[in-house]
Amino acid sequence: SLSGLSKVSAFIHRADIGGVLNVSELNLIKRLIQVQNQFKTFYNQLVEEDEGVKYPILDDKMNQLPVLTDLFQQINETCDTYDLYDNASYELQGIRSKISSTNQRIRQNLDRIVKSQANQKKLSDAIVTVRNERNVIPVKAEYRQDFNGIVHDQSASGQTLYIEPSSVVEMNNQISRLRHDEAIEKERILTQLTGYVAADKDALLVAEQVMGQLDFLIAKARYSRSIKGTKPIFKEERTVYLPKAYHPLLNRETVVANTIEFMEDIETVIITGPNTGGKTVTLKTLGLIIVMAQSGLLIPTLDGSQLSVFKNVYCDIGDEQSIEQSLSTFSSHMTNIVEILKNADKHSLVLFDELGAGTDPSEGAALAMSILDHVRKIGSLVMATTHYPELKAYSYNREGVMNASVEFDVDTLSPTYKLLMGVPGRSNAFDISKKLGLSLNIINKAKTMIGTDEKEINEMIESLERNYKRVETQRLELDRLVKEAEQVHDDLSKQYQQFQNYEKSLIEDAKEKANQKIKAATKEADDIIKDLRQLREQKGADVKEHELIDKKKRLDDHYEAKSIKQNVQKQKYDKIVAGDEVKVLSYGQKGEVLEIVNDEEAIVQMGIIKMKLPIEDLEKKQKEKVKPTKMVTRQNRQTIKTELDLRGYRYEDALIELDQYLDQAVLSNYEQVYIIHGKGTGALQKGVQQHLKKHKSVSDFRGGMPSEGGFGVTVATLK
């Protein structure tokens, strides 16, 4: 937790110019160091647990954090949250000890006075209290003359006097002197601590800056998690695609999310629809999400959002009238629009709410279209809301302009807040009037008063709305299926990676064990060869056979037929006879068989050495044989079936099996064969049919009839 962090740069600067920090200010500096150290520890543990994960930004921040352990210890050992410790210095401890003992003597003296039976009726209360930092007792005014001492205060009624008895005056004076000495010593200690702070001023300022940045990053992360935000993809080309976006200040559980998209070649979107239908909220949602994304925040949309970077976001939203300037609604809007048009460029996003409102409808609509034309020439991306019907036809007369609308539910007489991209808003006056009970005669007569073109336009818009809803439903289902498929793919990829890592670790372990065995065996072999050389040097060629056999036996003790070093199948032959050339497996050397001693042993000459060896340790050298020409014979028809079942085969194995089968079927003079691949996911069926399409022996193929196995079978016709 980063709670308790405060801005301390002002304290650090004051310490640097010779000021003295108090205990509270020192504790805020101590808290900064404490939080920094705790965060470092947490981050190091995080990195150790997630070895494969990299945090380059946080790594950079961690490397910037200074070491301030000494300063933390100095402050921590000197004071708590409220005051200096008694043992902050030897002098302070002595002063406070004297204050404590003197206070105790004063209390004892005053306790005797207030507990005296003779004084009970003279005191307002049998207690010791403090006035003006002096210990006093409450005496009734009429008994003032019975107590020798100094009056420090009296009650509001004047009935009680607070008197410091003369017996404790000197002790109270001593307390005052000690308090003065204590203040001087505390000032000295605080001055010393302030000097330590000044000495580490640069490091402290860096710590404050870095921890402030980390606090900001964590705040962004927590906010993004609270809105379940997603990371947008930024593109160089101008793009806005926000799937199921919603206003960040609205409750995600109840808000209606809408997909906001500027399709390719679309620069202007005009939203029409009923008042309070969500047009303005849509504008604000787009503007806020753009600013959030460019500020490094995750945004309230589904995964897959795409955005480009805008240099400026201009908006004219709401009726911000200026009372001082006495501007009307129209004038207020126009003032903002004029300023926007002065500064907007092709890298800007412009949002207009109720463009052209507040004046004559015909003039307002004409002005709105002219403004939109001007912004389009500038090249800005524009989203505007309006209730003017003239603007519905605007998009059909100009390239790069799209209509959109907010849906209205006639049955409930309320907006649904759903945004329909590509569908202009339509008038619902007749339907609403009918729902509210207006006479059909009146409604029908009203319909005759509007032109045929307008009727057709409304009917066209109604048809577009129905088609849009159907397509949107299908798209959402497709998005869901794609997301599920991606999740399955990710899960399988992770499992495959885990399997590969496990396989790699097994191989590495096996290699390590094999290397250890080979190393030990090699060392032993080197020792034996060394002994053999010494024997030869000592006795020349006159080496006793039993001496060689003894050395050979030491090698045999370390030889394993199934070791990793010789993990190959030995070749065995019917018989080894005298005169055969052989390979001695245990030595890896060639030799010639001189004599067969018995069924198990033979005498072999290897260079100048003659040895008796086990026959099973000998491998006969096979001479190269000329391979005979193979005759291709046609197999009997009855040995090849007219169907091939590939169910259960892996994809590559299935295609190999299919090739072999087709060759045999052609040799058997079959005209038609049945390939059974099953239904499954369809991958094997697709692979088989693509393979048949390219095969030189196949003239045609088709899917199986229901009686032949349906989609699980492909019937191939052979040439």
UniProtKB/Swiss-Prot annotation:
Its EC number is 3.1.-.-, 3.6.4.-. GO terms for molecular function: ATP binding; ATP hydrolysis activity; ATP-dependent DNA damage sensor activity; endonuclease activity; mismatched DNA binding; rRNA binding. Keywords: ATP-binding, DNA-binding, Endonuclease, Hydrolase, Nuclease, Nucleotide-binding, RNA-binding, rRNA-binding. This is Endonuclease MutS2. ATP binds at residues 273-280. Endonuclease that is involved in the suppression of homologous recombination and thus may have a key role in the control of bacterial genetic diversity. NCBIfam families: mutS2 (TIGR01069). Homodimer. Binds to stalled ribosomes, contacting rRNA. It comes from the Bacteria. Belongs to the DNA mismatch repair MutS family. MutS2 subfamily. Gene3D superfamilies: 3.30.1370.110, P-loop containing nucleotide triphosphate hydrolases. GO terms for biological process: mismatch repair; negative regulation of DNA recombination. It comes from Staphylococcus aureus. The keyword Cytoplasm does not apply. The keyword Signal does not apply. It is an enzyme of class 3 (hydrolase). Residues 644-719 form the Smr domain.
